[in-house]
Structure formats: structure tokens, C-alpha cells
Amino acid sequence: SLQLALKMYEVMVRTPHVKHWLPTRMHKFSKYQQVLTRMQALPNVMVRPSSDAIDGTFTAGVHGSTILPEGMTVPAGVKVCTAPTTNGKCSGCRACYSKDVPVVGYIAHGRKMAKVIRIAAMA
């Protein structure tokens, strides 16, 4: 809800010593635009509007994250999340939190995602 987003913004403002990373699909709805813009303007916050795609596609300048099918050639400008190779831990990587990293790609994982990708490939 918008009220929840405003509360999240308040927490971000009150914790300037903490880096916040906000992956979101709410960027598509106009009622959230103002609060997401305010969040992104904070030096300790990285808002990552998520692409809805599961094939690695994204719109440059709009999306901050995308899902990459396993084995896919990584699109230019995408930093691949390394957590799957480090037991699900960031292990010092802070790409998701960095305003210098335009797009983070997350490798698709799990049985449900494999099924979704398989069905999409047949379409």
C-alpha cells in the first residue's frame, strides 16, 4: 500500500547509516512514483525497479533488475548476482545496493521457475 511505502521511506530517512535496497514491481503504478523517487534520491537507498521478464530482457534506464535463465549469455551492462555460488550469501558483494550498478541479473532457480521458463519457451 502507499501508506506502507511512506512508512518505509520514513525508516530510510531515519537510518542514514544503513544502506537500503528495494527491489520492486510497484514502479508500474503511478501512485507509487513520487515516494519511489524520494527514496531513490536518498544517498543510502537503491530502488531497483524489477523487469517482469524471465528471459533476461529489461528496459535500460527503467529496470534495475531482471531474471536470467541459467546458461544464458548475460546482456551487456548486467551484473550477475553471485549469491547462488556462495551458499546464498552476498559474501561482500554490494551490487544490489550500489547506485553505480545499473542492472543486477538474478539467475532463475527452483522448480517453479524452471517450469515457468519451460512453458514460456513453448509459447
Region spans (language model):
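Class I S-adenosyl-L-methionine
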Residues: S1-A123
